[in-house]
Amino acid sequence: MNTYKKYLEEIRHRKKKGLKPKPIDNGKLLTHIINQITDQKNIHRKDSIDFFIYNVSPGTTSAAFVKANFLKEIILKKYIIKEIPTTFAFELLSHMKGGPSVKVLIDLAIGENLKNAQKAENVLKSQVFLYESDMERLKTAYHNGNKIAKNILQSYAKAEFFTKLPEIKEKIEVVTFIAGIGDISTDFLSPGSDAHSRSDRELHGKCIFEHDINKQNELLKLQKKHPDKIVMLVAEKGTMGVGSSRMSGVNNVALWIGREDSPYIPFVNIAPIVGGTNGISPIFLTTVDVTGGIGIDLKNWVKKKDAKGDPVLDANGDPILEEVFSVKTGKVLTIDTKKKILYDGNRKLSDISESFTPQKKEFMRAGGTYAVVFGKKLQSFASKVLNVDAPRVFSPPKQIYNAGQGLTAVEKIFNKNAIIEKKEK
């Protein structure tokens, strides 16, 4: 049985479980699929085109290398695929998240075909996930007098990959969904017993809420009722995301309530919105930032106090809580990202300034922390190559400083990386 037939068998098996075809990361399988695409009479050609466009894992998988190189051959007219014209081939490359796609784009940008070079230039200006080897290729081309490379580096020095992105929405309408009462652990969102399925995002997504199908269906029903709003997952009277720092917890939340990162990348969602009466666990909040999401300290319950200002205790000696405002499932609220306030209609509920610091808003705008980290490095690199000062685009990081006290080696490294150094005068 060839690799494609095995894949079809796997698809049939997954369909019985209510799963879609697994994203392709095997280069050998994708090569077989490409052969079927180039064969105009192949009975599997239509499905093969759909698999190629919509169901290949991005990044540095062997399939991503095969996909990027085939797109390059389409652009160079070695193959004429009517369903994938040149413009669309460039668009697909732009969604592949670095690695082999960037290598192909640089090949085209510094190549001899000016039309292709200009198209590759426009795509590269929007990319941030470049390896050092990619940056060195642009540097070498620039020093050799390549104008396209110069244009790309000038764009990077201005951080246009960030400044040309749309600002985050000023007002975001959310509908609440209480995932649980009390602290919610990452194990509730991504059980450790299901660790074996984490690489299969769709399959792993089915374990959210510890496989509670009724709760999952309630969430789906809520989304269907409010298609124009974003679901905010809430830990009522508790903290969201306590326990281990597993990224799969946030990935599962994003898969269920986040937005699609790309129409050409299957089962990768970003920007989930989560809230907790007592806020978000710091480690979990970091992983929310990685996805460009929003974490909100709701403060919707407070300790009841007596006339002296002391907490009122129940029969068990625990503080009695009073509800400040309701976030019961189905409650529609508005997040004002400019005023940094949570509203119920016109009623101000809570100050959420901590959720919208300048740095956090950058993560949201860029689609996650990695894009900002890579972007800063790219801007610094380009400005040094061009021997120009990098304009202040990103919020300045805070340097570590302790009066009368030395710095640890880690603190010194942090401070050095926190600054975009200006050229020497």
Give the ranges of each region predicted by the language model:
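Amphipathic alpha-helical packing elements
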Residues: 2-39, 360-364, 369-373
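Structural detector for internal amphipathic alpha-helices that build alpha-solenoid repeat scaffolds
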Residues: 19-22, 46-61, 76, 83-97, ...
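Short, 15-30-residue, compositionally biased linear elements
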Residues: 1-10, 99, 349-355
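Amphipathic alpha-helical scaffolding segments comprising HEAT/armadillo-like alpha-solenoid repeats
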Residues: 27-34, 58-77, 98-110, 129-141
